[in-house]
C-alpha cells in the first residue's frame, strides 16, 4: 500500500504562534482598528470643512476624468515635484513607495487572504501560496527596506544637514519615529517566525531576506529554544502587539498631522484647474459687483 503525503506549498500562517486564540485576536484587531480609522476620517473631515469656507469654484473640477486620473498617476509614480531637492525627493519616494508596498501588498492582501481565502473559500493555504507567496514576500522585504532607508535619509537631512529652509517640528520627529519603529518591529516579528521556519522549510526563508537577517540574530542570542532564552512565545506576542498598536497609531495620526498630505496632495492634483495657467474666470454681472478682488481668506475659492 502506498501512502501519499501532502506537501504543503510555501505559505504564511496567519496569526502564527497565536493560533490557539486567534479568533479573539481577530475580533480585538477589528475593534481596535476602528479607532484610528475614525481619527483619520475626522482629521480629513476637518480639512474638508476648512476648504468649504472658500467661495464656490467657477471652473469645472470633475470634467475630463481620464486626463485628471492620468495626471494623478504620473505625479504619484514620478514624485516629480519632490525632486527639486534630490535628498528630500529620495527620502519621500522611498517612504511613499515603501509604505504603499507594505500597506497594499502586505496588510491589505493578508486581510483578503484570511477573510476570503480561509474563511469564505475554506482554502487551507489561503489565496496566496506557492511561488506567488514567495514573490510577495520578496517584494514586501524590499518595501520594508525602502521605508527604513527613506526614514534614515529624512532624519539625517532634518537633524544633521539641517537646511535653512526646512522647518523643524516635533510632529516630523514623531512621524519618522513611528515609521521607523513600525518597520523594525515588522521585521522582528517576521524574523521570529522565520527562525522556526528555517528548521522545517529553510528554502522559503531566503525570500524573506529582511526577516532572515533578524532570524539569524535571534538564533545567535538563543531565541530558538536554547539558552539563554528558552521560549520565543512571549517575546513574539509582545513584539506583535507593539507592531500592531504602533501601526494603528500611525494610521490615526495621518488625519491629524502633515501626513494627511497623502490625501490632500492627491486631491489637489486630481482637482486642479485644467485651464491655461493664470486664466481668470469671467466675472458675472460685472456692473453689479460691489466688491473687487479678495481681502479675506474666505473670499478665495
Language model features by range: what are they?
Residues 2-301:
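Membrane-embedded alpha-helical bundles of multi-pass integral membrane proteins
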Amino acid at each position: 500500500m502506498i501512502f501519499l503525503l501532502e506537501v504543503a506549498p510555501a505559505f504564511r500562517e496567519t496569526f502564527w504562534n497565536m493560533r490557539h486564540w486567534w479568533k479573539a485576536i481577530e475580533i480585538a484587531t477589528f475593534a481596535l482598528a476602528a479607532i484610528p480609522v475614525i481619527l483619520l476620517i475626522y482629521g480629513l473631515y476637518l480639512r474638508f470643512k476648512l476648504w468649504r469656507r472658500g467661495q464656490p469654484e467657477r471652473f469645472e473640477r470633475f470634467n475630463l476624468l481620464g486626463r485628471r486620473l492620468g495626471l494623478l498617476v504620473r505625479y504619484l509614480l514620478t514624485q516629480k515635484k519632490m525632486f527639486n531637492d534630490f535628498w528630500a525627493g529620495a527620502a519621500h519616494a522611498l517612504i511613499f513607495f515603501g509604505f504603499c508596498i507594505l500597506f497594499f501588498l502586505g496588510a491589505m492582501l493578508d486581510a483578503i487572504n484570511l477573510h476570503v481565502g480561509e474563511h469564505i473559500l475554506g482554502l487551507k493555504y489561503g489565496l496566496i501560496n506557492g511561488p506567488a507567496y514567495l514573490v510577495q514576500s520578496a517584494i514586501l522585504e524590499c518595501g520594508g527596506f525602502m521605508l527604513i532607508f527613506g526614514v534614515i535619509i529624512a532624519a539625517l537631512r532634518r537633524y544633521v544637514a539641517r537646511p535653512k529652509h526646512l522647518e523643524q517640528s516635533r510632529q516630523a520627529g514623531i512621524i519618522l519615529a513611528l515609521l521607523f519603529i513600525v518597520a523594525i518591529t515588522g521585521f522582528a516579528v517576521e524574523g521570529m517566525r522565520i527562525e522556526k521556519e528555517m528548521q522545517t522549510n529553510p528554502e522559503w526563508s531566503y525570500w524573506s531576506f529582511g526577516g532572515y537577517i533578524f532570524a539569524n540574530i535571534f538564533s545567535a542570542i538563543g531565541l530558538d529554544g536554547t539558552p539563554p532564552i528558552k521560549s520565543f512565545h512571549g517575546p513574539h506576542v509582545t513584539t506583535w502587539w507593539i507592531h500592531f498598536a504602533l501601526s494603528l497609531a500611525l494610521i490615526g495620526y495621518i488625519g491629524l498631522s502633515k501626513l494627511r498630505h497623502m490625501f490632500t496632495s492627491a486631491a489637489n492634483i486630481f482637482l486642479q484647474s485644467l485651464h491655461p495657467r493664470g486664466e481668470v474666470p469671467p466675472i458675472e454681472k460685472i456692473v453689479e459687483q460691489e466688491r473687487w478682488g479678495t481681502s479675506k481668506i474666505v473670499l478665495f475659492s
